[in-house]
Amino acid sequence: MKMPASMEPDWKALLRVLRAHSATFYLGSLLFPKEARKGAWAVYAACRLGDEAVDGEGGGPEALEAWWAGVERAYRGRPLAEWEKGLAWALERWDIPFEAFLHMREGFLTDLGPVRLGTEAELLRYCYQVAGTVGRMMAPIAGGGKEAEARAVKLGQAMQLTNILRDVGEDLERDRVYLPLDLLRAHGVEVEDLRAGRVTPGYRALMAHLEGKARALYREGLAGLGHLKVGRAAIALAALQYRGILDKLRLSGYDNLGRRAHLKAWERALLLPKAFLAARFPPRPEGSP
């Protein structure tokens, strides 16, 4: 069903959100076919504005609830803001699970207060809530079924875990410690060590452990590319760029308390041929013949 002209989203407004917050995502999205590209823009804008409702200027509980009201309006087919219209447009075309947004909201609620995660299981749950859910939203747009959705969740978790490993120092400034407390204790690391910027042997061992977990999730997630009908190169490029941050982090000796690992523009560009190769010849799941 075609949306009334008054309900058609202002795609330029949504693009401004993308370009302001993630030029990398925008460039990758250009590898989608036209309609799927618009769907990716709409979903990204909705998710990004939820994140901004927590961390952006004026962010907080009230802003988050206002964002959530917008999600609900989009699902009821009564959007108001441009991003809501974009999401409603996507919902007319793909079966994007409401539950994924519900779980994302739970992750954003965690971010509102001081963050302390007790276990690795809690960390992975959080990674699912704020990023694995994006995989669930994107899988239908990319033409995937349940297997693709499950793999997309793994990829989202891998990318969020990469974010967490990259941003330990920045997150501390917001009183957020996503590194599981049980793993900190097991490696002889105190939160005060993090605040003091002490990159100890125990801390490096902890980082290496979580880096290994992230790499395993990338392997599981990238094996889902073969289940997608469109957008393989776009998704592969995003994953390879994030995985490249892990390489930078390792090369720095896991010194992420005072600096932030990132890829330069030319390094991201070099990954484009690899993304097309992964799209053409998707990695096989571990254990497959």
Curated annotation (Swiss-Prot):
MF GO annotations: 15-cis-phytoene synthase activity; geranylgeranyl diphosphate synthase activity; metal ion binding; squalene synthase [NAD(P)H] activity
A matching Pfam family: SQS_PSY
Signal peptide: none
Cofactor note: ATP is required for the transferase activity but it does not seem to be hydrolyzed during the reaction.
Lineage, opening ranks: Bacteria, Thermotogati, Deinococcota, Deinococci, Thermales
GO biological process, one term: carotenoid biosynthetic process
EC number: 2.5.1.-
Name of this chain's protein: Phytoene synthase
Keyword set includes Glycosyltransferase: no
Function: Involved in the biosynthesis of carotenoids. Catalyzes the condensation of two molecules of geranylgeranyl diphosphate (GGPP) to give prephytoene diphosphate (PPPP) and the subsequent rearrangement of the cyclopropylcarbinyl intermediate to yield phytoene.
InterPro entries linked to this entry: Isoprenoid_synthase_dom_sf, Squ/phyt_synthse, Squalene/phytoene_synthase_CS, Trans_IPPS_bact-type, Trans_IPPS_HH
